[in-house]
Amino acid sequence: MPDQISVSEFVAETHEDYKAPTASSFTTRTAQCRNTVAAIEEALDVDRMVLYKMKKSVKAINSSGLAHVENEEQYTQALEKFGGNCVCRDDPDLGSAFLKFSVFTKELTALFKNLIQNMNNIISFPLDSLLKGDLKGVKGDLKKPFDKAWKDYETKITKIEKEKKEHAKLHGMIRTEISGAEIAEEMEKERRFFQLQMCEYLLKVNEIKIKKGVDLLQNLIKYFHAQCNFFQDGLKAVESLKPSIETLSTDLHTIKQAQDEERRQLIQLRDILKSALQVEQKEDSQIRQSTAYSLHQPQGNKEHGTERNGSLYKKSDGIRKVWQKRKCSVKNGFLTISHGTANRPPAKLNLLTCQVKTNPEEKKCFDLISHDRTYHFQAEDEQECQIWMSVLQNSKEEALNNAFKGDDNTGENNIVQELTKEIISEVQRMTGNDVCCDCGAPDPTWLSTNLGILTCIECSGIHRELGVHYSRMQSLTLDVLGTSELLLAKNIGNAGFNEIMECCLPAEDSVKPNPGSDMNARKDYITAKYIERRYARKKHADNAAKLHSLCEAVKTRDIFGLLQAYADGVDLTEKIPLANGHEPDETALHLAVRSVDRTSLHIVDFLVQNSGNLDKQTGKGSTALHYCCLTDNAECLKLLLRGKASIEIANESGETPLDIAKRLKHEHCEELLTQALSGRFNSHVHVEYEWRLLHEDLDESDDDMDEKLQPSPNRREDRPISFYQLGSNQLQSNAVSLARDAANLAKEKQRAFMPSILQNETYGALLSGSPPPAQPAAPSTTSAPPLPPRNVGKVQTASSANTLWKTNSVSVDGGSRQRSSSDPPAVHPPLPPLRVTSTNPLTPTPPPPVAKTPSVMEALSQPSKPAPPGISQIRPPPLPPQPPSRLPQKKPAPGADKSTPLTNKGQPRGPVDLSATEALGPLSNAMVLQPPAPMPRKSQATKLKPKRVKALYNCVADNPDELTFSEGDVIIVDGEEDQEWWIGHIDGDPGRKGAFPVSFVHFIAD
């Protein structure tokens, strides 16, 4: 930093120079004077900028403060007017309170206005005068006189030094320096002028320092006192109002109690009136249901029909408002309006979003109000106008009725509707679903799709108030539901839900409402049950245990375990502790999508509907939608799109779900995503799912009923694989019958679907990104067939069973003769054996297993194709042998000591090959075939040689009473549980015993 001179040093040096110019050393300090002026100028420039910003801020505060004062005054006026209105309406207590607050606000406003004015006067004005006065101008203006004096001084001293050096040179001398004393007298005038300008500059700087320092702080002190006065006066106003406020609080409590009592009386009166009108409302609803939908506007004359072509005059939207003749046509619920020029496409209006109104001023004019504008039309005469209006209204009514009732002539859509009705009927028959989940009212018809429970109409209104993030309500009778909205209802139900969510409900003083409770009681209870979860059973306290239970519930596909985790308050979108995750940081939704199959789709649905965020990404940026597209999982994709999952998110590779679907050529996923992008995705979507419906046969013989009433020893659950498939309605004319036959495939108390039956190979093959192999590797030569149902209970007519079998069968070779126990196993899976009764009902059996491919879910999502006439020529992928039951007709099975006689088995059905007339003969004449007399069962004490069988496949037990064995194990048959399941133990290891499927073994020839 250059040397500078202080003010005191400058004064001392100047005085010394003034007294003794020849002895002074001031000439050596002139450079320091100039450095000092430059430094002061830099500091002043910085201060000038800061003070300018300060002034700007103060002005902004003043402007906003005045605007605030103006708004406060308007608020005060409104309070004063409102209080006056209350006083005039015989409510003096409330009116006086409003007036007091008006006066209080007015006082505070006046104090604040005074404070703003003080700030403007005390701070803003001095700053403005300083910046426009002493600090006015740009950098360097203040030191211009000093710079001129310095320049003159330097010029004169340079000139004198030059003359002195030339004079010495003339006399033969050389001078390098000239002392100050030599030129002191000659430079006195210039030196005095330089000292004067320096002194003037320092005086101005001193004045500026006072104004921007001491004076500004003095002003801030004044403003501080003004602020103190503002707060003190405001506190006085508050203290003066405090007693009135305390009295007012007591009065308001009394007034509110009176108003609450009045409200309670009104609610009771309303409930009484509602109950009195319930009968009339039911009658009205029945009448409305029996007739077509009635539009909430005048009906058109039905004689004019729903279609019309012609010309109308349309008033233009321009400034001139001229009538323009346009060609118009009404068809299929749309009004088409042609333009004046042929090259422009006509405007097409959906009448479902329009309303037709008459024009009271012009009899031959009418208006059509759409969602974005109003069209003014004029006909040739009044009669023509009435015809056009009738056609428009009729076409709209027809389109609306078609939308409500659907197209009954489309086979596939009709099948889905029939399936939906069957599912709804079974949901209503579930335990606890005959009454409301919350109040116990009978026959609830409102479904919470995200919780799977049924409520009455009163409780459903409270559910709607909670919001869709707690409960999504749909009507079973009024709304058109898709099967995807019934997944949770089919798997949870009121009884299972309340077992968890009402586990801690106090029994002695029950707060649960009854059907006659008012809406307040219902709201308090429902809020406590669903939002606070006050009565739910809480199993886990810490978050780690909650996440572990959530992970286990998803892994084991336990919907009630998932509901328990939900009741514990776990965050369903949090990352789960999964050691073998496909990608790091997976959520429960990622895991559910990754391990889903036809039986666990409801697990995904619960997570989709009750998670706050469907767009959580893994460590590699994948969302659940990415997983769906990687695995071609269209069913989960439907659920996620219905839940509004984002389709624009890209993973770490920059791929969106649609990009993945296109790259892997997953056409179904690509189509769904394209529909969602264009806004054409239907949220009421149908999903492929193993519904396991219970179907009650209408035509049952007396023998069937007797058989159902007999106690069945060692009854086991069934394990059917019954997929409801579309596209097979060509095999029979009645599509409804096909849907009913599909529902027949399921039995009572069905066994849970086991992963060993149908493994989800999709993720193992595709998540790695490598192409799947042509055939999945297996440890044995062939894969095991699906396990047969255990102890089938429901029966089916021969005709429907025959039709159903033809729909889902695969061609087989070989004859259909009855084999003895020593025959070798069949090469191809046989047809299910017939169970013959007095009326020849057929035991329903599951369809043949779907052949495993590298993408099982993709194969299952495809609808089944109708069997062509030459079905025997179509070969499915190789399936493992599934030999028929080895029970010889003339030998009882070992251990067949039963309390009832053994029903004789009919001959097994032959292949579907039309040439096998012997096999199809008994089936085609099923209604004529008489069953043989049943043979009496022999007691277990009968000495028979033990029957030995050999395992064809590996089998892992699903239940404790079942046998686990490996391929090649020899099993000793101890008894027969039913036609498809026997009892036995491993040869040489009697401790390993249990039930085993007959189709997994073959006899060893003795």
From Swiss-Prot:
UniProt modified residues of type Phosphoserine: S701, S822
Tissue specificity remark: Detected in heart, brain, placenta, kidney, monocytes and pancreas.
SMART domains: ANK, ArfGap, PH, SH3
Annotated positions of the Phosphothreonine modification: T903
Compositionally biased region (Polar residues): 288-300, 794-823
S-S bridge residues: none
Lineage: superkingdom: Eukaryota
Keyword Membrane: yes
Its job: Activates the small GTPases ARF1, ARF5 and ARF6. Regulates the formation of post-Golgi vesicles and modulates constitutive secretion. Modulates phagocytosis mediated by Fc gamma receptor and ARF6. Modulates PXN recruitment to focal contacts and cell migration.
Protein name as catalogued: Arf-GAP with SH3 domain, ANK repeat and PH domain-containing protein 2
Annotated organism of origin: Homo sapiens (Human)
